[in-house]
Swiss-Prot record:
This is Ribosomal RNA small subunit methyltransferase H. It catalyses: cytidine(1402) in 16S rRNA + S-adenosyl-L-methionine = N(4)-methylcytidine(1402) in 16S rRNA + S-adenosyl-L-homocysteine + H(+). It comes from the Bacteria. GO terms for biological process: rRNA base methylation. SUPFAM superfamilies: Putative methyltransferase TM0872, insert domain (SSF81799), S-adenosyl-L-methionine-dependent methyltransferases (SSF53335). Signal peptide: none annotated. HAMAP family: 16SrRNA_methyltr_H. GO terms for molecular function: rRNA (cytosine-N4-)-methyltransferase activity. The gene is rsmH.
């Protein structure tokens, strides 16, 4: 595998101790870190394994291969975690003891300006693809979607107020550009008139989150991974998931409580009661970072950690 030569900088692992405790690691067990990134969580897991233990690390971003652990107990999988079940079958694993998912976007992605993940970047291109070899980028979406589609995107994936006005402004602005809307700077200019000085960071974060989710089909991939996790874990195996925004957290919470990403409607709950979940929730309420970690690692501020055990 060829890895880029640039120095790799990834975030400090969030709630590392809580994640390890949640996995309840058996030294001889088999574990999967479906969001390998900088390898911080994976390194800590491997340190707790015996010579018989195994760890798989998933990451679709080619940059992550710079951090591969040189350890015979570790296998790196260059793939989106939505294919978890496929690869566990490929490697002949008939059941794993724990699965860890840290769903946050790494500091590395925000710092790599040419990737276009941050509204603070000087990126020449609005890309936002986690997998640089994958389909369309953010610029393509901004140029191809009509105002109605962009509005729905910003509303549902960014939970952006005045989504229609922002979408209309983008469509109007892109029509004035001969080459279409391509850069972070052009996107900022397209919405400048609608940005509130008091809510600038929040509004821009909503727009960029919505685009990133759409470009990478993040919620679709998360649903597939959560559904696959149940089949991949042994009875008594642990699922440890860290979320960073309400859309992700709602899906994880529903899966652990009801067994599906969408909660039953009120009529169904009233008539039939809650369906039997295949998960025992170890954390009834999500864990959050300690005061010390919040001070040491600001990225942990929005993290919510949920832990469950397969029944």
């Amino acid at each position: 595998m060829h890895c880029p030569d640039k120095e790799s900088v990834y975030h400090i692992p969030v709630m590392l101790g809580e994640c390890l405790e949640g996995l309840r690691i058996d030294p001889d067990g088999c574990y999967v870190d479906v969001t390998f990134g900088g390898g911080g969580h994976s390194r800590a897991i491997v340190e707790k394994l015996s010579s018989k233990g195994r760890l798989y690390g998933f990451d679709q971003d080619a940059d992550a291969c710079r951090n591969i652990l040189q350890d015979e107990r570790f296998t790196f999988v260059t793939s989106n975690f939505r294919y978890l079940a496929n690869f566990m079958d490929y490697y002949g694993e008939d059941g794993v003891d724990g699965i860890l998912a840290d769903l946050g976007v790494s500091s590395h992605h925000f710092d790599e300006e040419e990737r276009g993940f941050s509204f603070r970047s000087e990126s020449p291109l609005l890309d936002m693809r986690m997998n640089a070899r994958a389909g369309r980028n953010a610029a393509a979406i901004l140029n191809e979607y009509d105002a109605s589609s962009l509005s729905a995107l910003f509303y549902h994936y960014g939970e952006l107020k005045q989504a229609r006005r922002f979408a209309a402004s983008i469509v109007h602005y892109r029509e004035s550009l001969s080459g279409g809307l391509q850069t972070v700077g052009q996107l900022l200019e397209a919405v400048r008139g609608l940005i509130s000085p008091r809510e600038e960071k929040k509004q821009l974060a909503c727009i960029f989150q919505a685009l990133r989710i759409e470009v990478n089909d993040e919620l679709g991939a998360l649903q597939q991974m959560l559904e696959a996790a149940l089949g991949c874990l042994r009875s008594g195996g642990r699922l440890v998931v860290m979320t960073y925004h309400s859309l992700e957290d709602r899906m994880v919470k529903n899966v652990l409580r009801y067994g599906t990403v969408k909660a039953p409607d009120e009529d169904s709950l009233r008539l039939y009661g809650a369906p039997q979940s295949p998960w025992q929730q170890i954390t009834r309420k999500p864990l959050t970072a300690s005061t010390k970690e919040l001070s040491d690692n600001p990225r942990s501020r929005s993290a919510k950690l949920r832990i469950a055990e397969k029944i």
